[in-house]
Curated annotation (Swiss-Prot):
Protein name in the entry: Protein-export protein SecB
Annotated gene: secB
InterPro entries: SecB, SecB-like_sf
Gene Ontology cellular component terms for the protein in this record: cytoplasm
A Pfam match: SecB
Length: 166
């Protein structure tokens, strides 16, 4: 039995890299809402290597929540009827600095694009829920995310672009 074992994945630090919350139609939008708005979520993962001589990476989980509500039919102010109004836009980039130790090269990509975002996700979900609630709206509660599926879709897209550029 060895005296010290080094964890293969170490989360050195995690932090809010960028946070933005906008309510472009305030305060009027609050009087129009009679039900929860429709919320569209976009999620992405970016990785940046921080040290050339070591496996130290910044992994950023980027989330954008954009809520819309149907425009009132009798606007009377020249606004386009039928076009959805933007209720709020929340942008969050939540990052962590990870050190990988003893992970085979062929496993680094899935660790960075699947396991690292999995560790960051609960914190990002909580921040997004808090900021939307504090903005006067029902909290946006993100459901579980299939990071394996996102990684596989990214690989398939990258493979398709490689073939198209050949």
């Amino acid at each position: 039995m060895s005296e010290t074992q080094i964890a293969p994945l170490t989360l050195n630090i995690q932090y809010t890299k960028d946070l933005s919350f906008e309510v472009p139609g305030a305060p009027a939008i609050y009087t129009l809402l009679r039900q929860a708005p429709t919320v569209n979520i976009n999620l992405d993962v970016q990785v940046q290597r921080l040290q050339d001589d070591a496996h130290v990476y910044e992994v950023t989980l980027t989330t954008r929540a954009e809520a819309t509500h149907p425009a009132p039919a009798e606007s009377g102010n020249g606004a386009e009827g039928g076009k959805d109004l933007t209720v709020f836009i929340a942008d969050l980039s939540y990052a962590g600095v990870f050190t990988l130790t003893g992970i085979p090269d062929n496993q680094i990509e899935p660790v960075l694009l699947v396991e690292c975002p999995r560790l960051l996700f609960p914190f990002a979900r909580n921040i997004l829920a808090d900021v939307t609630r504090d903005g006067g709206f029902p909290p946006v509660m993100l459901g579980p995310v299939d990071f394996v599926g996102l990684w596989q879709a990214r690989r398939a897209q990258d493979d398709g672009e490689t073939i198209a550029n050949a």
